[in-house]
């Protein structure tokens, strides 16, 4: 098993957060 470091967890959370924001913005633009 590979141990996941804290830095990798932070990067994963930030990337997921940014992806969610971009998806919400695209959704709002499409629903207008």
Swiss-Prot record:
Pfam families: PsaM. Keywords: Chloroplast, Membrane, Photosynthesis, Photosystem I, Plastid, Thylakoid, Transmembrane, Transmembrane helix. It is a single-pass membrane protein. It is found in: Plastid, Chloroplast thylakoid membrane. GO terms for cellular component: chloroplast thylakoid membrane; photosystem I. The chain crosses the membrane at residues 10-27. InterPro entries: PSI_PsaM, PSI_PsaM_sf. One of its GO terms (biological process) is photosynthesis. The keyword Cell division does not apply. Belongs to the PsaM family. HAMAP family: PSI_PsaM. This is Photosystem I reaction center subunit XII.
């Amino acid at each position: 098993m590979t141990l996941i470091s804290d830095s990798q967890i932070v990067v994963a959370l930030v990337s997921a957060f940014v992806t969610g924001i971009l998806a919400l913005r695209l959704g709002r633009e499409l629903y207008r």
